[in-house]
């Protein structure tokens, strides 16, 4: 029969897992921030061009295409919920960092505290999935 896991191994394993989520959420917050802001700026510029089509003769000839691009871009932004995904990733990145800090300040042999932090982490993972995945 194998020996029960040493508290330090459980502690280190939990720290590695939380650290992995910190890196993951940070990476995806950057990705979704870029998608969100690039799409928003593009939509604003294209919509402004469509609105100014009467004053800008060169744009008048492609106004219908620009209007279509604005409609498609807006639909994609709404469907993908880029803002919600971006906010979800950066919000949970902060939460994972706070949990990691709590873990760092906890003695590895304090099994009860480590187990409580693990339960908190598991709940956080479920909440994280809900926050960043579109409905």
Annotated model-derived regions:
Residues 1-62, 66, 72-135:
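Conserved non-transmembrane functional hotspots
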């Amino acid at each position: 029969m194998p020996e029960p896991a040493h508290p330090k191994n459980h502690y280190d394993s939990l720290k590695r897992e939380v650290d992995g989520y910190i890196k993951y959420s940070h990476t995806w917050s950057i990705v979704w921030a870029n998608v969100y802001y690039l799409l928003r700026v593009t939509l604003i510029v294209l919509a402004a061009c469509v609105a100014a089509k009467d004053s800008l003769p060169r744009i008048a000839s492609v106004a219908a295409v620009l209007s279509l691009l604005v409609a498609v871009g807006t639909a994609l932004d709404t469907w993908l919920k880029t803002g919600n995904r971006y906010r979800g990733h950066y919000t949970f990145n902060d939460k994972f960092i706070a949990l990691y800090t709590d873990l760092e300040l906890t003695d590895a042999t304090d099994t009860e505290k480590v187990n409580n932090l693990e339960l908190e982490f598991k709940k956080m993972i479920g909440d994280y999935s809900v926050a960043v995945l579109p409905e």
